[in-house]
UniProtKB/Swiss-Prot annotation:
This protein's UniProt keywords: Aminoacyl-tRNA synthetase, ATP-binding, Cytoplasm, Ligase, Nucleotide-binding, Protein biosynthesis, RNA-binding
Gene transcribed to yield this protein: tyrS
Superkingdom assignment: Bacteria
Descriptive protein name: Tyrosine--tRNA ligase
Family: Belongs to the class-I aminoacyl-tRNA synthetase family. TyrS type 1 subfamily.
GO molecular function, one term: tyrosine-tRNA ligase activity
EC number, as in UniProt: 6.1.1.1
Sequence motif 'KMSKS' region, residues: 237-241
Amino acid sequence: MTYIPKSDFMAVMMARGFMADCTDYQGLDEALLKGVQPAYIGFDATAKSLHVGSLIQIMMLRWFQKTGHKPLTLMGGGTTKVGDPSFRADERPLLGPEAIDDNIAGIKQVFSAYIDYSDAPTGALMLNNAEWLDNLNYLDFLRDIGRHFSINRMLSFESVKSRLDREQSLSFLEFNYMILQAYDFMELYRRYGCILQLGGSDQWGNIVNGIDLTRRVIDGEVYGLTSPLLTTSDGKKMGKSQSGAVWLNADMFSPYEFWQFWRNTTDADVGRFLKLYTELPLDECERLGALAGSEINAAKITLANEVTTLLHGAEAAATAAQTARDVFEKGGVGDDLPTLTLSAEDVAQGISIVQLIVKSGLANSGKEAKRLIAENGAKMDDAPLTNAGLMIDAAALQSPIKLSAGKKRHAMVQLG
C-alpha cells in the first residue's frame, strides 16, 4: 500500500499493522481531518466475555479515540438472535433473550478498560442494536430495505461462498444477518452521524453491504476499514491457548493466565504484537522485536506487562509478573496462580489426578491429561507424575498442591 495518510488515525493504523483494507483510503482520510467523527464496531453477545481474538478491534477503537474521534461500541442484542455466518462451518446455536442480556453485561466490563465513556466530545457510547431491530415490522422492512439487496451479489461474498462450496447448509435466518448488519450501519449514520465501520477482514462483505445501503437509502457518505485476521507465526489463530480460549474477563481467565499467554509469545511474533497490542513507540517495538537469543525474553515480559496493564491494571500486571518470577525463577508457588478450590464432598471418595488436571484447566480432556502424564509432562509439587491412576483424598489436600503441565503452565488445588 503506497497511500500516504494525512490523518493521525489512518497513520497509526498503517504504521502499526492494523490495516487490511479500506473502501476509500483518501475519502476516509479527508473526512477524519474535518473534526470529531464517530466510528463503530459491532460485537455479538455469543459468550459472557470476548476473547483475545477481539482485542485488535478494541485497540482500533482505543486508537480512534486517542486520535480525536468518537468510538461507538455496538452490542448485538438483536443480531445475536440470528447469528453471523461469516466463515463458519456450521450454524450458531440460538440464544434466548436472558442469555444474550447476561452475555452483554459480561462483555461490557472489558470496554471501560480501553475506552473512555465520559461526556467529552470524544466520549464513547455503548449502544445495543436491539433498540431498533426488535421493533422492526417485517413487511415494511422487506419493502423498504430488502429491495436494495441483490441475492446474486450476496452469494458472491467469500464468507457465504466458502460455506456453500463446502455444501454446508446456510439457513435463511443466517442469510438475513448480512441485511441486519447493513441496517445497523445505516441506523448509526442516521442517529449519530457515524461515518465508519471497523471490523476484521471476515466482515468485509457485511461492511460493504452497509455502505451501499446507507448511500442508496439516505445518500450518506460512509466508509469501511478492516484489520487482518491475525494468526501467529506458526499459523495458529489468535484467541486460543493450550488450555482453551483466552477470555478477556478476569473471572474467566485470570490476569496471571493472561500475562502468561503473552509471555509465551513466539519469538517471531513479538515485534508485531507489541505494535498491535501496546502503545509503546514504534521504534521501541522494533528494537524489542529485533532482540535475539535469551534477550528476546525481556521483550516478551515487556509485552506481557504492557498488555496486561491495559486490560487488568498495573497492579494486576505486577502481581502476575511477580508470580511468574516466584514460580519459574525461585521454584515457589506465587500468589496469583490459577486456583481450583474443592469441597470436602468433592474428595470424599477421592478424586483422580487425571480429573484434577482437567478441572484445574491444565488439560482439555482426560485423554490429554493421561498423555501429559505418560510423556512425563505433568508434575505435582514439582515432582513428576507417573501414575495416571493416582487418587487424591482430603488428607493429601491438607496443604494446597501445585500441579504443572510442562514448564510454563501451573495451577494450585486446595480444599475450601
